[in-house]
């Protein structure tokens, strides 16, 4: 099913049920498990499935590829190490409520609209809020 060209492997409801289960890190799992360990996808095909395909399907014109004029969204990772870490419970919701989370493994940095927002240690505390709400897609 993952190899079906009509299947989108890059959608998640991470956060919708965060107290019960956690889909965060599904992209890292795709890169580590299905690309590196199982060889089901090439690295290029996985990058397309995670970024290019959703931008194409949803008509988001300036996303999904590294091209002049496109938003410079980038995940820098080590293909030999990339994975998601073990799931763990944290108590950082209102009232000290618990949720599940997972850490990135083998990720060196994240850039949103050309601005670095995370490094190998996690979110940068002084990073600008570089994201933008997309309100229009192509017709």
Residue ranges and their predicted role:
Residues 1-139:
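Active-site microenvironment of metallo-dependent hydrolases
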């Amino acid at each position: 099913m993952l190899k079906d060209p009509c299947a989108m492997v890059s959608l998640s409801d991470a956060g919708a049920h965060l107290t019960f289960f956690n889909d965060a890190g599904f992209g890292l799992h795709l890169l580590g498990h299905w690309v590196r360990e199982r060889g089901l996808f090439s690295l290029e095909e996985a990058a397309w499935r995670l970024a290019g395909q959703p931008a194409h399907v949803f008509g988001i014109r300036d996303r999904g590829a590294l091209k002049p004029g496109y938003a410079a969204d980038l995940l820098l990772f080590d293909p030999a190490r990339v994975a998601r870490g073990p799931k763990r419970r944290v108590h950082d919701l209102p009232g000290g409520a618990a949720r599940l989370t997972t850490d990135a493994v083998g990720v060196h940095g994240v850039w949103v609209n050309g601005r670095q927002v995370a490094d190998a240690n996690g979110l940068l505390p002084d990073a600008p809020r570089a994201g933008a709400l997309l309100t229009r897609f192509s017709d």
